[in-house]
Curated annotation (Swiss-Prot):
It is found in: Cytoplasm. This is Ribosome maturation factor RimM. Residues 143-220 form the PRC barrel domain. One of its GO terms (cellular component) is ribosome. Gene3D superfamilies: PRC-barrel domain, RimM. It comes from Cupriavidus metallidurans (strain ATCC 43123 / DSM 2839 / NBRC 102507 / CH34) (Ralstonia metallidurans). GO terms for molecular function: ribosome binding.
Amino acid sequence: MTGNASGRKPLNLAATQGGASGRQKKLPAALLFTDTLPDDLVEVGYVGAAYGIRGWIKVQPHADDASALLHARRWWLLRAPPAGVVSAPAQSAEAVSIKISQSREHSGTVVAQPAGVSDRSVAEMLKGRRVWVRRADFPAAEEGEFYWVDLIGCAVVNEQGEALGEVTGLIDNGAHQILQVAYELPDGKAAERLIPFVDAFLRTVDTPARRIVVDWGLDY
């Protein structure tokens, strides 16, 4: 997702199949990924349906900005987390790795043709799987833009050097993005600060150092 923060834009980019006869279908062995999953995978969408009759799939991105999906030439399709779990760490069980031959945006989704898949029935077996791509395969962010995944986990301090907490998420309220910053109260209870991700409060964002400096008081 792209959001406007006065020049700073954080980019957001987290079932058993059966045939008509009731027999379980198995994915082609060539699609199964048996090695260790890359450690920089980021969940960016899910397979909503097969598209057409030639093995294309339709993916619903998790964010308005689908640039990561369109830029990456290899996707990992992993089983959805258990019911009630919104997202979960990538698990290698029955992981599918596909090379993308073609992809394009289509009515708020991304449609793609996996290499080696030319049959709609195989594409249908991928429905419901979460789509992960490597962070290394994201397109480079433009000046003043940041991917949300790079902001989460950053320490937040103010100009006085006082620790404000750690970024645990972001909210898009339509006008701008808001950092969700978790911290601990003196009595040990967890609390949260909501800091607008706009130039009025931002001083520096150093993602390699995992540090964000803001104009924000401890008592705000």
